[in-house]
């Protein structure tokens, strides 16, 4: 028996979804990421292109910011800021048609991710001007992870006291032994 040498197979990257293909046609650079467990298309974007890409997606029907948040990939790794956009008006219009097929009922949604270095002060442009609902969501992400949102109208802590040191949801955060709260009255 002779064995033929097998050529190593390189795992194929994710297939571009409809939103990625649309962004390519519009000339927007982005990174294809694996879809999430529900099949939602996930796209990586550079922070300098975030506002332009979000504005283009909003013009294409993604009229609802369902969620904005952040997470820490681990000590020494990157911070991630994500935006989940939904084409809500299209979904409402489809509901009125009465077509209950799974393809007609499918909601157009996309998740954008911006990967940031934890060195210095991570920052990216605020999308508050495009989605007013980003107000408290961006403030919470700032409060918990220390990501600054340039152009945000209220750039201050939301949950933690103003004089709190550090960013509590970063994985390298060291909780202080003692913090004295002032009386509220």
UniProtKB/Swiss-Prot annotation:
Kindly indicate whether the keyword NADP belongs to this entry: yes
What is the role of this chain? Answer: NDH-1 shuttles electrons from an unknown electron donor, via FMN and iron-sulfur (Fe-S) centers, to quinones in the respiratory and/or the photosynthetic chain. The immediate electron acceptor for the enzyme in this species is believed to be plastoquinone. Couples the redox reaction to proton translocation, and thus conserves the redox energy in a proton gradient. Cyanobacterial NDH-1 also plays a role in inorganic carbon-concentration.
**What terms describe the molecular function in GO for this protein?**
NADH dehydrogenase (ubiquinone) activity; quinone binding
Q: Which residue spans adopt a coiled-coil conformation according to this UniProt entry? A: none
What is the name attached to this protein's record? NAD(P)H-quinone oxidoreductase subunit J
Query: Which controlled-vocabulary keywords does the entry list?
Result: Membrane, NAD, NADP, Plastoquinone, Quinone, Thylakoid, Translocase, Transport
Keyword Cell wall biogenesis/degradation in the entry? The reply is: no
**Where is it located?**
Cellular thylakoid membrane
Reaction(s) this enzyme catalyzes, per UniProt: a plastoquinone + NADH + (n+1) H(+)(in) = a plastoquinol + NAD(+) + n H(+)(out); a plastoquinone + NADPH + (n+1) H(+)(in) = a plastoquinol + NADP(+) + n H(+)(out)
Regarding the membrane, this protein is recorded as: Peripheral membrane protein
A GO biological-process term: photosynthesis, light reaction
Q: Which organism is it from?
A: Prochlorococcus marinus (strain MIT 9303)
Q: Which Pfam families match?
A: Complex1_30kDa
> Major location, coarse class?
membrane
Which gene holds the coding sequence for this protein? ndhJ
Task: Give the quaternary structure.
Answer: NDH-1 can be composed of about 15 different subunits; different subcomplexes with different compositions have been identified which probably have different functions.
Q: What family does the entry list?
A: Belongs to the complex I 30 kDa subunit family.
- Might you report a single GO cellular component term? plasma membrane-derived thylakoid membrane
